[in-house]
Amino acid sequence: MSNFSPVSVLVASLLVAAPAAAKEPTAKIEGGIIEGIIESGLRIFRGIPYAAPPVGNLRWRDPQPVKPWSGTRLAKSFAASCQQDEGKPFGPYTKSFVTSGERSEDCLYLNIWAPEREKVKKPVYLFIHGGGFQSGGADMPAYDGAGLARKDAVVVTINYRLGSFGFFAHPDLSRESPLGVSGNYGILDAIEALRWVRANIAKFGGDPDKVTVAGQSAGSFIVNALLVSPLAKGLFQRAVLESGPELGLPMQALTAREASGTASLKRAGVTDIAGLRDISAADFVKKAASGFPLPIVDGKIIPKNPEDPATPLASEGPIIIGYNRDEATILQGQSIATFKKEVETRYAAIADRILAIYPHATDAEAANSIARLGRDRRVAGMLLWAERRTSKNAPVFAYSFEHVFPGIDPVQNGAFHTAEVPYILGALHFSDATFVGADQKISDEMQERWLAFMRTGNPGKARSKPKWRAASLDPASIWRIAPADAEPLLDAEKLQMFRDFAAKGGKLGLL
């Protein structure tokens, strides 16, 4: 007589037939072995350390090597974002555009999305987040890299030190640094992340000789700095600058920032850098941090102003640059009552020409002209930057993102600052907005062109029409992600006006 019941036989057969659970992916990298997850055909690793925690005695030091670990380190969750104030949704910036996890000085981590199959090396896309050098993090849902990775690429996102932890200078810090400078720790973090990628990305199926470094807003400026930094030479082959400060970001010299650091030391009530390193991050921010620290021209990491056409490129290669139509709705505001004052203050050298071209007889006209003036200024700055940076080995391709984000007031916010990022990365589903087929079509087309650029250096090799050609001083060379009835970009008269303004030292970028 059989000892097996019909039920037990059925259960046993199901157990035999059931496929084995997918084995979690592992990789042996600098420091040791890490374990990630498998999700929808991708290997995903989150919270990978690319440098030692910059805490204690390592606060305000160049990135240091990771301390090796034993066993297998889990890399399944995002690490903390770098030290910053708590982010809260505002305006069009819903929770998908805000870092919501922990914040800590221990933050030098990166994340990787890679196709499960790695028979052929994939192009690599390393994305550097924005946030005015004060906020942001790689854990933001809008920066999820899975969508682009599914198109056969390896996507990397990184954290870098922010605010006074990333851009603090002091004479004693400069003296103790092997480079002899201080104040650009956030830039050094990005360089270290690129170095890590070059050394390790093949373990994830990525091609270290096809690395595109991309950044948005503050991240775009970092990419601009990387282009001229000798320390980043050979670490990437292509670059993308989204909503960057081309011809626009003011930069201080090292000596000026060191003086600011000396004042911070006094405010903290300590006598030396060791004392400043001993106080907590919260106390430092409360007592000693000041102003709006930005990258500086230090003569070593950033040898000269990246926006100066005389500054040579340390890394030559194809570049994509672009702006969103309505950047100013968030960053500039509606100065209706002060239109003339704005023009006469910011554009003194060409104020009469601007006032003659842009209508401002009524509040409504002035409001429209403020928005239009900001758009024209940025387009002109982008084209002039492209003219200065284009070379035989480094063609520049320009775009204008003019698609209105779903559920957003087209007049008040429109194609706002940062709106393009989830379209490029394929992270639309993380937003609170309701996207339709047209949005997915735009995302697919942008990804197709970006992937062609990542693979070949030429986004014009994508199948999409119209053909995207290299930028020139002709506004028609700009690829526009815009509705068919979109108004024309700036004309020749306006372009010449802004060119004259830039020649006299005027700033045309985002800030």
Protein language model features and the residues they cover:
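Mobile gating loops/cap/lid regions near enzyme active sites that modulate substrate access
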Residues: 83-86, 380-511
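Active-site loop->helix "elbow" adjoining a glycine-rich segment at hydrolase catalytic centers
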Residues: 130, 185-189, 217-220
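Short glycine-enriched nucleophile-adjacent loop
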Residues: 220-232
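Alpha/beta-hydrolase fold nucleophile elbow
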Residues: 123, 204-216
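Bacterial N-terminal signal peptides
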Residues: 6-17
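Alpha/beta-hydrolase active-site loop
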Residues: 107, 179-202, 256-259
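Substrate-access "cap/lid" subdomains that shape
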Residues: 95-96, 195, 199, 233, ...
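Non-catalytic accessory segments of hydrolases
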Residues: 20-184, 435-446, 454-463, 484-485, ...
